[in-house]
């Protein structure tokens, strides 16, 4: 099991790289994360919902993702509550205290999934969540040491040196663990190092002397990996240069599936800017309203920041606008939540650019899809994750024609606005090229983002092989008993 001293220490990436190394060696390996809290999710072939990190790790292992790889997914919809998804299916919304009481049920699902994976594969690489040192969350823990103790699983601890204080993080984490949990930690990996390794060596020697545990390696800071982020929104401007399409995406408080824009970030003809609160929307050729876990609250927040007026101004000057999933729902005339699925029952005026209304409903739509853009026929593949039913005249001009005979979304009569429920809209090469051309790119080029992701997994595995003592690390993770 790989645990981290903090969130974003590198657990997901390390597990993905180790999965690829094991897969290369012919080992039947599967990833597993007992509990994930994230708004970035993926859809399995059978219509289940799991964290995107586990879908990426499955790809690294040469597998199709399954719900057993992430049996518990928590999707925050407020500061104190989340939608609880067990084995890929929503079980309802719970606040933090109610979920604490629910944990024995969640743990049963976790152990059942882990048992099935253990029976099918030679090696199951487990990823923890956050940090095992959160002493206030130790009771009924199912994500870190609580799980490791339940299945007698050895643990490697990873820490991010780039944020500073790496030795305090590692030694402090051990100090917060019980004696049996400390004994379970077999060693350390230090991530995101930049500089002269010889200057770090005295610290590594001190760490081993203090703890009696080895450092399995120091990983360099890797730039340019095209791998799905667990949840943190990447707000840095993309590195495109020359004449490019200026794309602006408002960072909503409950933004979901911002991995939709990874393919755009990697495209040499696109400059992506994620705009946070308190900042004006800069001049753009294309504005994209992203998915949201709390559409009405995020729409109210968007208005409170004056971004509705900025979008109207953008359209007056000829800019293009795309709404994806929750962003699509915002573009209609009205949003209705009669059952209070996102809070109090009620309704809210949409931005009014497309003639349709959306009513939130309990049944969640979860499916992988293939189809073509309605205008031009470029092939695409994506997935649906939404609880809304959208109806209205605007849907007579669909954005997408699906292979199963359905249509999706809408395009405005003037062709300036496109709305769709589909995530992964820019991942397919031809669809990405067609959408960039629609948005104003002359001689738009296709880019195979799936190939970029696969090349990144290979580069990651090569880096781990060069910088880790893999025989010692894998030996330390050998199944006990």
Curated annotation (Swiss-Prot):
Catalyzes amidations at positions B, D, E, and G on adenosylcobyrinic A,C-diamide. NH(2) groups are provided by glutamine, and one molecule of ATP is hydrogenolyzed for each amidation. The lineage of its organism: Bacteria, Pseudomonadati, Pseudomonadota, Betaproteobacteria, Burkholderiales. Belongs to the CobB/CobQ family. CobQ subfamily. Pathway: Cofactor biosynthesis; adenosylcobalamin biosynthesis. The keyword Ubl conjugation does not apply. The keyword Cell wall biogenesis/degradation does not apply. This is Cobyric acid synthase. Gene3D superfamilies: 3.40.50.880, P-loop containing nucleotide triphosphate hydrolases. GO terms for biological process: cobalamin biosynthetic process. Pfam families: CbiA, GATase_3. The active site is at 325 (nucleophile), 423. CDD domains: CobQ_N, GATase1_CobQ. PROSITE patterns: GATASE_COBBQ.
């Amino acid at each position: 099991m790989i645990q981290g001293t903090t969130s974003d220490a590198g657990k997901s990436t390390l597990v993905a790289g180790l999965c690829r190394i094991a897969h290369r060696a012919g080992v039947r390996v599967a990833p597993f994360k007992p509990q994930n809290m994230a708004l970035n999710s993926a859809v399995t072939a059978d219509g289940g919902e799991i964290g995107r990190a586990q879908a990426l790790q499955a790809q690294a292992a040469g597998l199709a993702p399954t719900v057993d790889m992430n049996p518990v997914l928590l999707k925050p919809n407020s500061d104190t509550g989340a939608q609880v998804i067990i084995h890929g299916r929503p079980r309802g919304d719970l606040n933090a205290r109610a979920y604490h009481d629910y944990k024995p049920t969640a743990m049963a699902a976790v152990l059942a999934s882990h048992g099935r994976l253990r029976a099918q594969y030679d090696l199951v690489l487990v990823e923890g969540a956050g940090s095992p040192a959160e002493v206030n969350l130790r009771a009924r823990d199912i994500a870190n040491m609580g799980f490791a103790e339940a299945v007698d699983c050895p643990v490697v601890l990873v820490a991010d040196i780039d944020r500073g204080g790496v030795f305090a993080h590692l030694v402090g984490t051990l100090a917060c663990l019980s004696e049996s949990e400390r004994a379970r930690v077999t060693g350390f990996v230090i991530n995101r190092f930049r500089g002269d390794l010889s200057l770090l060596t005295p610290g590594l020697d001190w760490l081993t002397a203090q703890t009696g545990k080895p450092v399995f390696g120091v990983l360099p800071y890797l730039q340019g990996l095209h791998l799905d982020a667990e949840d943190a929104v990447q707000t840095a401007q993309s590195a495109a240069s020359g004449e490019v399409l200026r794309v602006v995406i408002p960072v909503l408080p409950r933004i979901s599936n911002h991995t939709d824009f990874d393919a755009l970030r990697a495209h040499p003809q696109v400059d992506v800017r994620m705009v946070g609160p308190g900042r004006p929307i800069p001049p753009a050729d294309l504005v994209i309203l992203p998915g949201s876990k709390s559409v009405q609250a995020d729409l109210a927040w968007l208005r409170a920041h004056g971004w509705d007026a900025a979008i109207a101004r953008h359209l007056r000057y000829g800019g293009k606008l795309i709404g994806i999933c929750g962003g699509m729902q915002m573009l209609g005339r009205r949003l209705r939540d009669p059952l209070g699925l996102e809070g109090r029952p009620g309704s809210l005026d949409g931005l009014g650019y497309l003639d349709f209304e959306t009513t939130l409903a309990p049944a969640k739509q979860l499916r992988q899809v293939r189809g073509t853009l309605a205008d031009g026929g470029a092939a695409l593949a994506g997935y649906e994750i939404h609880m809304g039913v959208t109806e209205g005249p605007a849907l007579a001009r669909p954005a997408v024609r699906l292979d199963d005979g359905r249509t999706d979304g809408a395009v405005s009569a003037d062709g300036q606005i496109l709305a769709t429920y589909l995530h992964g809209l820019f991942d397919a090469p031809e669809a990405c090229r067609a959408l960039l051309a629609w948005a104003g790119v002359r001689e738009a080029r296709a880019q195979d983002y799936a190939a970029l992701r696969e090349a990144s997994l290979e580069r990651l595995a090569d880096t781990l092989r060069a910088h880790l003592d893999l025989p010692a690390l894998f030996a330390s993770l050998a199944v006990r008993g």
